[in-house]
Regions:
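Extracellular LysM carbohydrate-binding repeats and other cell-envelope/extracellular binding modules
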Residues: 5, 42-77
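Short, solvent-exposed loop/turn segments at the edges of extracellular beta-sandwich modules
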Residues: 5-12
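Primarily a LysM-type cell-wall glycan-binding module
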Residues: 15-44, 61
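Short secondary-structure "cap/edge" segments that initiate or terminate local elements
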Residues: 69-191, 309-326
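Aromatic-rich beta-strand edge motifs centered on tyrosine
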Residues: 116, 130-131, 177-179, 195-197, ...
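Beta-turn initiation residues at beta-strand->coil junctions
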Residues: 169-171, 205-208, 216, 222-228, ...
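Extended, loop-rich substrate-binding clefts of extracytoplasmic carbohydrate-active enzymes
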Residues: 186-209
């Protein structure tokens, strides 16, 4: 807080104190409602004090938090070292410029990358699948499925201090769009177009005609294919995903555990997928709608060392070098 005392002619008046406040420096993928929730203040109070026109955070911006009820530093837990690693290159995830061989190993980087499907149903425009991806070189990232994993709809938009816009993709990679005139440029070789809307951003995938729509918080709200079939996402008041609705209107309901990780997904037919975590925060096992259990084992750095199928057979055994390469 700030104190001030008026003085005139050698005489001092009453000393007054300002409201207590703190200054928070934004990260590229922070969410304003969660910052407000952490410090125990109303989101509208922050927006009014800062005269903010939208809620999309920008790396390096400083936010004035008036009368915080909690003064411990906020950390979104998003990206950290993982974020820095991806910004250095686009070789995490199954990108266009990556060569894979043997198991799902990126031969450019030695990164172990794996995609698995938990459930599939028939729907308009083709099968609708619940998928998740694992990146060993992204094991420092703790997301909605523990360390190293991303969910199919874990997509976000964020901004850097220089005005670049980041697209955090569902395969664990990041695409950086750089400002160019009144628009943005995608990296060379990437067939994407980014446009700004009244409500946020839209990314168009030129090779298949699909589009990904993001709101003013940078959260994914809808995916639409070239035929206009839309998958829509809904969030709770704290901006955690609560449901996914397919083009035909079928709903997948999301449940979270006490640490806001995916606990279960209930399918339209009432069956479900459950997710269990070990004490270190790793995704330890997944139980599919048929009752089959897949197990995962990790080292102390959250890198997957083995996984076992529904029959208990070990499918993969990984060893890593000092650089985290398989």
């Amino acid at each position: 807080y700030v104190t001030a005392t008026a003085s005139f002619g050698g005489k001092s008046g009453k000393t007054v104190e300002s409201d207590r406040f703190l200054i928070y420096e934004e990260g590229a993928f922070d969410l304003m409602p969660r910052i407000a929730q952490h410090y125990g203040v109303e989101l509208n109070t922050i927006l009014a004090d800062m005269r903010m026109q939208d809620c999309l955070t920008r790396q390096g911006n400083r936010i004035f938090i008036r009368e915080p009820k909690n003064t411990t530093a906020y950390s979104s837990g998003v990206l950290s070292e993982y974020y820095k690693a991806i910004i250095d290159g686009l070789l995490l995830g199954r990108a266009e410029n990556c060569e894979f061989g043997y198991e799902p190993v990126n031969l450019n980087t030695g990164n172990f990358y794996m995609e698995q499907t938990d459930a599939t149903i028939a729907d308009i425009g083709g099968d609708f699948a619940l998928t998740r991806q694992y990146n060993a070189k992204g094991a420092a990232y703790e997301g909605s499925l523990g360390f190293g994993w991303t969910f199919a709809y874990d997509e976000r938009m964020g901004e850097l201090a220089d005005g670049s816009v980041l697209w955090l993709r569902n395969n664990g990679g990041i695409i950086t769009f750089t400002p160019a005139g009144e628009g943005y440029l995608a990296p060379a070789g990437c067939d994407y177009e980014l446009s700004e809307t009244e409500n946020g951003y839209v990314v168009e995938i030129l090779d298949d005609g699909s589009r990904h729509e993001f709101d003013s918080f940078g959260l994914l709200r809808a995916v639409e294919d070239s035929c206009g079939n839309r998958t829509e996402l809904a969030y709770d008041v704290d901006l955690y995903l609560k449901s996914i609705t397919t083009p035909s209107g079928k709903e997948f309901r999301i449940a979270l555990d006490e640490k806001n990780r995916l606990s279960s997904i209930t399918l339209p037919d009432g069956h479900g997928v459950t997710y269990t975590y070990d004490e270190a925060g790793n995704l330890a096992q997944v139980t599919n709608p048929a009752g089959g259990v897949v197990r995962y084992v990790y080292d102390d750095s959250h890198r997957m060392t083995a996984w076992y199928d529904e029959n208990g057979h070990r499918v993969v055994a990984n060893e890593y070098d000092g650089e985290g390469r398989v």
